[in-house]
Amino acid sequence: MLPRFLWRPVLCSYRALGSPSRSLTVSYRNLSCLALLHKGAFAAPTSRSLFCAERPISTGCTSLQVKDKRVSVQSTSDGAPPQNASHKVKEAGRDFTYFIVVLIGIGVTGGLFYVVFEELFSSSSPSKIYGEALEKCRSHPEVIGAFGEPIKGYGETTRRGRRQHVSHMEFVKDGIKCMRLKFYIEGSEPRKQGTVHIEVKENPASGKYEFQYIFVEIDTYPRRTIIIEDNR
């Protein structure tokens, strides 16, 4: 069955023609054309619908391509930027600066370790000489009898009561290095205090310091001097 809106052209063409046979032929022609149109009316929308359906698909593909391009650009921006010559020069300069800082730190640390080692363990350090002289005082019978045990030693005392390092003085005599030290001792005897005087001289053969003299002055009454060692 043809739709109603297609029957009106057929009737109009039939009335316009004079001969029934001619009108019949025209009617058949019109009917065949209308049948073709009828088929095309149902086919055309299908093709048009397919065409319309294809356009969104093609548009969707285009949008997908744009999205892919955007993703690729985004991945490029997120990744490592291309390094040019100036950027490489800046990085090399920065690495060289870090290397210099590390070398300076290592040098300062090595210097500190050297100073500490010389101060504590070297035979020519004042701390080492002070320790050896204090042990001689602790083992001397007269010192033990005068001050009592245990005997402890300390350096100069500040106004705030803090005890500093042992005072010492280095000098050269007849081309030989010498050193004089002074520290204080006290024991279990109340109000008993003594001052220890030391002089050492470097042995040219061994390079070590040797004691020239060690003596203790008792600062309280009765005052006297205890000679522990005298090699002059």
Curated annotation (Swiss-Prot):
Protein name from the UniProt record: Mitochondrial import inner membrane translocase subunit Tim21
Entry superkingdom: Eukaryota
Principal place of residence: mitochondrion
Sorted UniProt keywords: Membrane, Mitochondrion, Protein transport, Transit peptide, Translocation, Transmembrane, Transmembrane helix, Transport
One CC-aspect GO term: TIM23 mitochondrial import inner membrane translocase complex
Keyword Electron transport: no
Location(s) in or outside the cell: Mitochondrion membrane
Protein family according to the UniProt entry: Belongs to the TIM21 family.
Function, as annotated: May participate in the translocation of transit peptide-containing proteins across the mitochondrial inner membrane.
Presequence range in chain numbering: 1-31
Transmembrane segments: 96-116
Membrane association type: Single-pass membrane protein
Keyword Membrane: yes
InterPro entries found in the cross-reference section: Tim21, Tim21_IMS_sf
Pfam families hit by this protein: TIM21
Organism (species): Xenopus laevis (African clawed frog)
GO BP annotation list: protein import into mitochondrial matrix
